[in-house]
Amino acid sequence: MDLEMTLATAETIHGWTTASELEWLFQTARSLPCGAVWVELGVWKGRSFFTVAMGLRRRSKLIAVDSFTPTVTSLPFVPSQDWVQDHFRAVYSGIKRLREDLRIEVVRLDTSEASRLVPDASVDVVYFDADHSREGLAKDLSAWIPKVKLGGLFCGHDYNEGFPGVIELVDELFPAREIIPETSIWQARKSNMS
């Protein structure tokens, strides 16, 4: 699926990821080699997950990690956590039909605990979009930093004034980080210093 069709489809999936952010996710996934491994922490209904799946090259692996606990049901437009999971299942089924060449795993665990299932230095990209508190992101980063290959990419969503803990922690841990223009996505490469 090309970028234009991917974005048009992704925008039918409810979520907070903007068109610019979706485009960046698609292009970043597309830039990886065949057989790459991408982990997304926090998938909600699957908007960014779908976009990454359409961007990845053949034989790549996409791992979605989410506890699917009812943390967002306090939002007025979310009637129940089952409603969220039903939407994600529909997106997941669509991806499986469209991208039979991908290896896809959905891990229903706490995002930091799920890192135990993944070998060290085996992941090309980890996209952090789960717990947006400083403490939660710190826990996820601590668990997932060893899993990323040298030269691999850490990136995350919601680097904005609505989540000051994300800004503080990312700036502290990754002083050379980059903020993608016109988005709230941050990125940093794993080096010997990470």
For the regions a protein language model found, what residue spans apply to each?
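S-adenosylmethionine/decaboxylated-SAM
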Residues: 2-19, 23-194
